[in-house]
Amino acid sequence: SNNEVCYPATLIVGDIVKAFKSGRYDPANTCVAITQTGGQCRASNYISLIKKALIENGYTNTPVVSLAFGSGIENEQSGFKVNWLKVLPIILASVLYSDCIAKFYYAAVVREKERGQAARLRDLYLDTAQPIIQKNKPEDLLSYSYLAARDFNKICEQRSCHKVGIVGEIFLKFNPFAQKDVTSWLINQKIEVIPPLISDFFMQGFVNLKVRQNQHLQRKLTPDFVIDWLYKKVQKQINKVNEIGKSFNYFIPFESIFE
């Protein structure tokens, strides 16, 4: 790598090549997909970087797809179309579900009665979610969130713990290797980690849009009432998750991105 490719991009592109070299994936029957925000970052060149890395390693027939809303960064591929209206509800439910499980896990792992209980529950509920997501049943994820809250309660001892939040660049916050596994170190010190939330990364788009429009940095392509309606729909789902989360004794609710 060099100073033209950021550290997260180096790791992500390297992981993709490493996955193919492991032999677990057939390059001829595999597609590489990555989300794109189009932000002012060298990682916005992910598509070209991934293509270059795959070609240089001999994987010339593996298509690379960009999952993006913005124009000019989609890298469209024939045979690959996303019905966003159909998949957005399950995407939202999946993001909130994973964030909810993270909240349960990090609060429980420093209070578990027996070592390993929290990790087993985390893995169980993440594995349980996979077929539900494939069947596109967002309401079922809400039901399993409630069951998870109940089960995480059962493994916890009543204990007060110091709390530490993880902040910073998005990839470093979520990838243990990238942040030298600081979360595990904190857990071993019996410090409760306040996990980063992937939902906040997407919810900030509502704030960013309003700021850019108010500062006349972006045209109003969509009426305000449409954006407000969409935000209320999303917030309604968040409120449902907060109600379910209350069943867990150490649950910290999702907050409004505007507060």
What does each model-found stretch correspond to?
Residues S1-E259:
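An N-terminal assembly and electron-transfer interface module characteristic of large anaerobic redox
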